[in-house]
Amino acid sequence: MTNRMELSGTVVKDPIRSQSPAGISHCRFWLEHRSVVVEADLPRQVFCRMPVVVSGKGSQDITQQIVLGSNIKVSGFVAYQTGRNGVGKLVLHADDIIHI
């Protein structure tokens, strides 16, 4: 099975950096993507906002320059997470981020 996603866009919420009780570093932010793609031979405007999380000891190096308004390309895998309020969402777990 394959679970790989690449998405470019703009950081639209300030990154939140934290550390788990086990000492694992995390950085969470929201990425907004806008583009035009061709579907059924017609141009279609595409928009999405997706939460992104970067975890692990290398996360600080990858995310230290990410701020509100950064234009980046994120690669990673997608997982479903349920929040404390019971509402679920897809989250992009990034392992590579490039500033564009």
Swiss-Prot record:
GO terms for cellular component: primosome complex. Pfam families: SSB_1. Keywords: DNA replication, DNA-binding, Primosome. It comes from the Bacteria. Homodimer. Interacts with PriA and DnaT. Component of the replication restart primosome. Primosome assembly occurs via a 'hand-off' mechanism. PriA binds to replication forks, subsequently PriB then DnaT bind; DnaT then displaces ssDNA to generate the helicase loading substrate. Belongs to the PriB family. Involved in the restart of stalled replication forks, which reloads the replicative helicase on sites other than the origin of replication; the PriA-PriB pathway is the major replication restart pathway. During primosome assembly it facilitates complex formation between PriA and DnaT on DNA; stabilizes PriA on DNA. Stimulates the DNA unwinding activity of PriA helicase. HAMAP family: PriB (MF_00720). This is Replication restart protein PriB. It comes from Vibrio vulnificus (strain YJ016).
